[in-house]
Amino acid sequence: MAKNRPAKKDNNKEKKGKKEKGVGKRMKKEAMIQAIISVFQSSPKEPFNYKQISKIIGVENQVQKLQVVDILYDLSAEDIITEIDRGRYRLNGLGTMAVGTFARRSNGKNSFIPEDGGTPVFIAERNSGHAMDGDKVKVQLFAKRKGAEPEGEVVEILESKERTFVGKLQVAKGFAFLITENKTLANDIFIPKDKLKGGKNGDKAIVRIVEWPDEAKNPLGEVIDILGIAGQNTAEMHAILAEFGLPYKYPSSVEKAADKIPEAISPEEIENREDFRGITTFTIDPKDAKDFDDALSARRLDNGNWEVGVHIADVTHYVKTDGVIDKEAQSRATSVYLVDRTIPMLPERLCNQICSLRPDEEKLCFSAVFELNSDAVVQNSRICRTIIKSDRRFTYEEAQEVIETGEGDYKEEILALNDLAKKLRERRFKSGAINFDRYEVKFEIDEQGKPVRVYFKISKDANKLIEEFMLLANRTVAEFVGRPPKGKTKKTFVYRIHELPDPDKMENFASFIRRFGYKLKTDGTKTDVSKGINSLLDNVQGKPEENLIETVAIRAMQKARYSTENIGHYGLAFEYYTHFTSPIRRYPDMMVHRLLERYLAGGRSVIQKKYEDLCDHCSSMEQVAANAERASIKYKQVEFMQDKLGMVFDGVISGVTEWGLYVELNENKCEGLVPIRDLDDDYYEFDEKNYCLLGRRKKRQYRLGDPITIKVAQANLERKQLDFQLAE
């Protein structure tokens, strides 16, 4: 259809100085264009003429109405809108359809991520179709103006995520709402009084959205569980778990199944295993640990070498494939470690009793046994099912005291193992392993769950001793399956893999550290790069910028994950690596144990796709668990700082965003935000490339890594947010 531009009136005939009828506030042309496009996008199937458009966007000035006419003509020429009959236009419906994932944000900046990996597309709330974060959707892409970001409209929700949200109930006389704490949903959820499930005003609750009518501002929901009174520690920790879709209690059917598992070991089972009960064996674990899933045995051989057994709880002997316990463990994929509690992958009877390698109790294990010479070179190894009896349970502190003083129980074995571990570690770093030796922030918690002290957990020789032998066992198991003898076909297996770092991220990291006076070579072999990183990490030890540089270095790395396709582990510099040593708390280790049992017995390879899907699930759940752990740490940080409002602390800028500066305090590593709106001495703009905020007039910079002094302004527990102000 021809595009007809309506004739303009001759405005020169107007008398000079005569006020036009309906003169309103003038709009700039670009703002008018955006406003007009928004009208069409909000009602993509409705036609509009220039009068309707003018009224909707608030244009009363006759001159600007004519400008609306011109803009409509131009947008039609660009195929953004279509003229369906003379002077009436509709949004161009010829935009392509795409399928992908919807990302909802409470600030209205929703987006659509195409499954083919294309550019993210902005989805205005009015065009969201009430899709939820993570939904698989079909989107119609709008015709795009040159230079503008792509936009679209959700036309169909193909797959829905669970529509459950955590928050605080607000109960009035005739109605109730859930005030959500979710960063993806700005709208409170309306709850009919008969759907409260006994919930009271101020309770922490989980609510499921059951309906969201097209024209309704708020979705309708029903309470599915009451977590307790908001502010109480258990309620808040359970709320964090629920927020991430993690379970906070065990199904009774699974616990009943665990209760039926016999603890006694039959003589026939012992007969089929290597017997290590007479060999010195002990565990070394954190002092608050209950699930001891690994033990070490050590004895000196007649030839002067040491035989070291890495004994791992034989969980899969008790947990049968596809049983109710296995299905629950597979769903969870990992134990979750919050600040004050552990949410186990397996029922307590298994992880803390039957499978826990407690002292003076006979236990079934899957073991990797090594003969090492005085240089810690493996002379031979074997993987076998065993029975052990631990002689002693050491805490890390107790084992460390033996190492430092040379005195104590089983001192000969511990000192020998420590010497071997140091040599294994030294050789690993020479091969290109990266030494991220960061300290952990820990909280001392009182009986009410309140944090009373922050301290730093530092890895010492006793920790590193255990780490090295676990790494050795994991690598050996992976090599056993992944590197079969000549003439044998490689079989499907579960590997722990770690890709090389992204070159662009490494370049940005190298640029970042130059401001501190450090250099990093980012080209050359992968060993050259890893050795350069290790040299850098050595140089920053004890410096104020140490924690920041290590944090940014870790961000530049890829995330390790599980896969049936082995590509090696870059960070550890291992060609083959897996997770074998923690089946009580990681489902991939259970998969590895089952595959090992099958292949040791000469079994055929399993179907790869089934295990690759399980690998993807476990990698995903590992990340979810880590996010929940971080959320619990953040909650306790805010709680710890509540009585420190107005106090001044030194810190370092740990993050720079368009909305402000994140500052990590030197004293306790608590992190808070200095909002950009509070930087009122200038207008600051975010320079993403240089990790800084730059003042437009005075050119003052706030850069990542800069030292800064702040005052604690606010500690908001509900939002898990600390707000700081500049102290100077």
Give residue spans per PLM region.
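Electropositive polyanion-binding surfaces
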Residues: 55, 206, 212-213, 239, ...
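Charge-lined substrate channels and their catalytic hotspots, especially those that engage the 3′ end
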Residues: 2-309, 316-361, 394, 692-693, ...
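A short macromolecule-binding patch
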Residues: 119-124, 185-191, 669-686
